[in-house]
């Protein structure tokens, strides 16, 4: 993985066709293959082009609440239960930077429209949340997971990840500890069978 890809709206990767495009897919880390901070993770792939890929871990909450995060950036969040929601570890790259995966897309300064969802990195989405008119559903992370050109394809060929079409219900409505098994159910995969087989469905 690499930190060479910077996810700004003015730096959206080119849309050259890929043989396999993992955008809007869940990647599930294969036990015993993916190690370190990404072991056991489910990653939602926001962008995947010839220049690389960018995703957010969706099942690794931190000890930081949204209220505390907002306080750190001089915003006051008093809306419950939003203020008690947890901030997630989004990946090992730029862990001091916030990323908001949300629905509906809305109109924010630095956003990438992902179809049903959007990824926003600008402060205005958090200001909207503080004002009580933010996105109806959101997941806030610090950091992201990034791959350089060809890296994700290589890792898939090495069976490092399982992939399946993303389901926003799992992102927003399923408890973090249940998101990995819930994503596995989309594949019809038994956890004990993960040691072998191809990296994608």
UniProtKB/Swiss-Prot annotation:
Entry GO terms, CC: cytosol
Which Pfam families does UniProt cross-reference here? DUF179
User: InterPro entries, per this entry?
Assistant: AlgH-like
> Source organism's superkingdom?
Bacteria
Similarity annotation: Belongs to the UPF0301 (AlgH) family.
From the Swiss-Prot or TrEMBL record, give the protein name: UPF0301 protein BP0319
Q: Native species of this protein? A: Bordetella pertussis (strain Tohama I / ATCC BAA-589 / NCTC 13251)
């Amino acid at each position: 993985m690499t930190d060479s890809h910077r996810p700004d709206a003015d730096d959206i990767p080119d849309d050259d066709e890929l043989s396999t495009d993992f955008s809007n897919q869940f990647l599930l880390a294969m036990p015993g293959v993916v190690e370190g901070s990404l072991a056991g993770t489910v990653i939602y792939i926001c962008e995947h082009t010839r220049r690389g890929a960018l995703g957010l871990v969706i099942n690794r909450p931190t000890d930081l609440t949204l209220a505390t995060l907002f306080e750190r950036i001089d915003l006051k969040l008093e809306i419950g239960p939003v203020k008690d929601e947890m901030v997630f570890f989004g990946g090992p790259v730029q862990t001091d930077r916030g990323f908001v995966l949300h629905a509906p897309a809305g109109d924010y300064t630095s956003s990438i429209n992902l179809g049903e969802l959007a990824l926003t990195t600008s402060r205005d989405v958090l200001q909207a949340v503080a004002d009580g008119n933010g996105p109806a559903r959101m997941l806030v992370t610090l950091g992201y997971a990034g791959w350089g050109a060809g890296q994700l394809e290589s890792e898939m060929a090495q069976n490092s990840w399982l992939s399946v079409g993303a389901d926003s219900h799992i992102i927003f409505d399923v408890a973090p500890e249940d998101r990995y098994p819930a994503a596995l159910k989309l594949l019809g995969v038994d956890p004990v069978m993960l040691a072998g087989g191809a990296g994608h469905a």
